[in-house]
Amino acid sequence: MTAHLRPVLAGLPVYVPGKTVPGAIKLASNETVFGPLPSVRAAIEHATQSINRYPDNGCLAVKAALARHVSSLSAADFGPEHIAVGCGSVSLCQQLVQITASVGDEVIFGWRSFELYPPQVQVAGATAIQVPLTNHTFDLEAMLAAVTERTRLIIVCDPNNPTSTVVQPEALAEFVRSVPPHILVAIDEAYVEYLRDGTVPDSPHLVRTHSNVVVLRTFSKAYGLAGLRVGYAVGQPDVIAPLDKVYVPFTVSSLAQAAAIASVQAADELLARTDAVVAERGRVSAELRAAGFTVPPSQANFVWLPLEDRTTDFVTQAAKAHIVVRPYGADGVRVTIAAPEENDALLRFARCWITHRDGAR
């Protein structure tokens, strides 16, 4: 006899990560091309001496380091009680859904956005309210209009994954002011370190001035710790404490905690690396536009190509050229900004592909 499982799981999509193909250029997972700093590597190596022991379940040293770091980014002071640590920001997002939404409740986010939002809401038994983007960007006015008495959580992915766009800081602040205070607003800032051109929101200030705001960040992208899985949330203690209650014990390993602390201590050196990525982002975007592609203005470490019905062909032909990119149904393709020589290979392929496509019409 087959075990009785939750019916909701039958229609739940399985998360498909970016492909890794031996010998191919991988531009599918928004990973940094930079390896760990020597100081971070040394911290990880030192932590291996005690991996026979469980990690600190409270991540106390990590929280203290992050509280100091976040305080340095804002005029406000933060303590460890304002910080939750999790197995990547994606796990913290799932925890946020767990503490806010259940059967009959609604969670609002723009779409298309991070593809794990819908299944996380579905698993909780809640309803995902997907508000269409406008010009590849979150439509904050439409999201406000979607609020009902059943709304429990609103997620703003900023910069948005996969479209790479950002909402203006003033618009985000006004949006937060307009959301009813009993509804939690989560600002997912996985790519915040790549923001430039005056687009960096003062999200720590929003946390301190609005009790219903929580910010999610990760060490997987700019800090280069994707393989260790550690992220954090910044919020008011009455939000952080419930997050810790639904944290799966010991999921942030000793190695991840040591690497996170060392990375925060070397934040200036690590974040200086993002300048090279931003420069390449500008070059790749400009050359793709010159070749005839539509490329929304990116504020992340990737670009978005809204190819619609041409998506499958682009992805298939790119794979034949030993380049792996990330397709999103019939919407488009996300392409990671990588090392200059890898970006050059992508540009050569893209020019060839669009010339062939245009010539075939």
Swiss-Prot record:
Gene responsible for this protein: pat
EC number of this enzyme: 2.6.1.57
Protein keywords: Aminotransferase, Pyridoxal phosphate, Transferase
Native source species: Mycobacterium ulcerans (strain Agy99)
Keyword Transferase belongs to the record: yes
GO annotation, biological process: L-histidine biosynthetic process
Pfam families tied to this protein: Aminotran_1_2
Function recorded in the entry: Aminotransferase that catalyzes the conversion of aromatic amino acids and 2-oxoglutarate into corresponding aromatic oxo acids and L-glutamate.
InterPro entries linked to this entry: Aminotrans_II_pyridoxalP_BS, Aminotransferase_I/II_large, ArAT, HisP_aminotrans, HistidinolP_aminotransfase, PyrdxlP-dep_Trfase, PyrdxlP-dep_Trfase_major, PyrdxlP-dep_Trfase_small
Name by which UniProt lists this protein: Aromatic amino acid aminotransferase
Modified residues (N6-(pyridoxal phosphate)lysine): K221
Assembly with partners or alone: Homodimer.
Cofactor(s) required, per the database record: pyridoxal 5'-phosphate
Reaction equations catalysed: an aromatic L-alpha-amino acid + 2-oxoglutarate = an aromatic oxo-acid + L-glutamate
One annotated GO molecular function: pyridoxal phosphate binding
Family, similarity comment: Belongs to the class-II pyridoxal-phosphate-dependent aminotransferase family.
